[in-house]
Amino acid sequence: MPKDKKMWDNILTVIMSLLCLLWIYPIVLILQNSLKIEGTFTTSTVFKLPTAETFAGLSNYIYGVTKMGFLSSLGYSLVITVTSVALILLCCSMTGWYLTRVNNKLSKFMNLLIVFSMVVPFQMVMFTLSKTADTLNLNTPWNICIIYLGFGAGLAVFMFTGFMKSVPIEIEEAAMIDGCSPIQIFFKVVFPILKPTMISTAILETMWVWNDYLLPTLVLDIKKYRTIPMAIQYFRGGYGRVELAPMMACIIIAIIPIIILYMTCQKYIIEGVVAGAVKG
């Protein structure tokens, strides 16, 4: 029996390794072509490593950053991502705490309503949302954060609610006896306990908001505000020609922050998801 288990473990390791290579290969392909001189790679050379004649060094990265206004797009992406994730964490952690501790029909209905929002396809509401956002002048980087709060609330509340069900209420009752108000109980007692779920939720929401293209395109004023995915999409050279090498260089730059964030905090994702789903 142990031999069979070891064999299946080895088979699973091989399968997962192959899937990992399959997942990483497109990124490697983009990276190697971002180092080639623009116009030197075609369908027959796209899979080949750069040679001495086609190697461009960092020129595509420098050109891409200066050409597409990378710094302004980076600023908009940072503002939208940081603000949206902060709002999601603050509002949804308080909501999850409330729904767990206030056990009545209204809280149960609200919980079902929030979880139901997770299964509603974005495509069902995107045109109505775009028109409403334009009517209410929500087409700015600050106002789109409110929309992200609405769409990100389902997953966040689900995770916070599941985790809070495993937290003994006696801790909060002891704080209440000591004279703490509900706000003090949340920020001084509950908030520190939520750290694993808080970090994992922040990572998941950050990856979503940072890489999102469709919602900013529908809501934001494209002429004034462009996030990094939007800037990459609208990257054009002379006469509307798509410059693939600088575009690929910008794609690599755009994914670096998310890779660093994920590699730094990946252990918290598993802890938070397990705490929010299994314990709940």
Predicted regions: what they are:
Residues P2-G280:
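A structural signal for multi-pass alpha-helical bundles of membrane permease subunits
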